[in-house]
């Protein structure tokens, strides 16, 4: 089965994905195999429904938000390259990557890109700030009915009050980064991919 995956990916495509995402040859081959097993329509793309069949996403309270991150605006299918680009945000940063070429593009799994990815999970209307309502929606997704609306409102208000530095009653990306400056985002937003 692994050989099927490697034969369908051209060497040049494999090299481009490797360069763009930082995944190893064997990781790309393994993830391609996973991609094709999820591709129920066998058309080389995944739909939202394909993602919803992944048990870990189905039970994750933010599963729908994570699934949405795989799709470009207005798109309802994602190809293998787009799939890999999104997964690259969750690739752990290796020691040898910390001293990468400063003139090259920033790796998709950099702290900055991981923070942008996390910010987009909260910024539901894509206006580059997290409003009280957006924060409430995400909190509601995470805790369900276990906490009253009043308590959730209090948590949202306190969070915005602590993070909002410019007084606009919302959290900008800069404010989001400031709040998370002491959080090990690189570790918390990483998934170990087998080599």
From Swiss-Prot:
> Motif Nuclear export signal 2: residue span?
176-185
Keyword match Nucleus: yes
Q: What is the effect of changing residue 139 to A?
A: Predominantly located in the cytoplasm. Predominantly located in the nucleus
Domain EF-hand residue range list: 26-61, 71-106, 110-145, 151-186
Q: Which family does it belong to?
A: Belongs to the calcineurin regulatory subunit family. CHP subfamily.
Q: What does this protein do?
A: Calcium-binding protein involved in different processes such as regulation of vesicular trafficking, plasma membrane Na(+)/H(+) exchanger and gene transcription. Involved in the constitutive exocytic membrane traffic. Mediates the association between microtubules and membrane-bound organelles of the endoplasmic reticulum and Golgi apparatus and is also required for the targeting and fusion of transcytotic vesicles (TCV) with the plasma membrane. Functions as an integral cofactor in cell pH regulation by controlling plasma membrane-type Na(+)/H(+) exchange activity.
Record's protein name:
Calcineurin B homologous protein 1
